[in-house]
Amino acid sequence: MGKLKRLTERFFGPRPEKIGGNGLYATLEELMEQRRYVPYLKSHQFNHIVSSSAGDVKSAFKGRGVELEEIRSYAFGDDIRDIDWRVTARRQVPYTKLFAEEKDREIYVVLDLSAHMVFGTRIELKSTAASKIAALFGWLSLENKDRFGCLIYDGKETYVFKPQNSRAGMMAILKKISEVGVRILKQSYVGSLVKPLQLLQQTIKSRAAVFVVSDFNEFDDAARKVMATLAKRTQLYCINVYDVLEDRAPKSGEYMVAEGKERLVFDTHAKVFRNMYHNYFAEKRAVLQEFCRRFSCRYIAFRTDEGPFYRMFQNR
């Protein structure tokens, strides 16, 4: 961690004192602060020291700079890298893709701020970490001259912001994220991701990049079906935000967990219980990872007590 701190301070300057939210929610100032990481994400040095996960994120904002215009018969001199092998196999003669210059790109974040995201045992809640990740992607989109759109889901309502490339639009998104982050501390709702995903599916263009930022605790069959459809049309990223307590059971002892007015006491002395505990979350993660593998999505995990940039550095 000491090396990471020196590296980040070298590129970003000393980190300002924590403002406001104290990990319970992301303040507008904290969301705006995420912009300070953008120059480094775009820098040459970034390519040499980040993990493969971070490289996957960066690739969403680069693209080819072109979009598919048509598919026609292969002609002498065409780039063989543009051959459409599916059409070629079907028609038994070579076909190639023709591309036109892409003016801009749409980047979407589906931000899950429903009830199960209001949980955290170290540093900050999952909802807070997810909010900061969404803000970082937004700033990176604007810097790259892409249009950024966001769907903020609180378990009941979905707040839709259409893609645009403007600071005013970005500020409106950040204000709503912070506002919802405060409100869900008092009243939160459990809901399926299928609701915001269906709204996105109705309007999204092909070749867009979509980041679903969630803990995927409500990753039901309906949500999987919609995401599978989106994966065929877009570059889809599953950003799995989780707490360390969801990764492994705490040390042997008795613990109490509170959710609203409900209280649950559990005993971790028994090794059998600790193994069952670990396997429960490991199996859920494996289901999501298998979905991503099957539908060619990118899976990236962020733990709340590490922060996005620590995650990018840790697989050096």
What is each model feature region?
Residues G2-V57, S73-D78, V87, T96-K132, ...:
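Exposed, interaction-prone extracellular/peripheral surfaces
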Residues F61-G65:
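A positional/architectural concept
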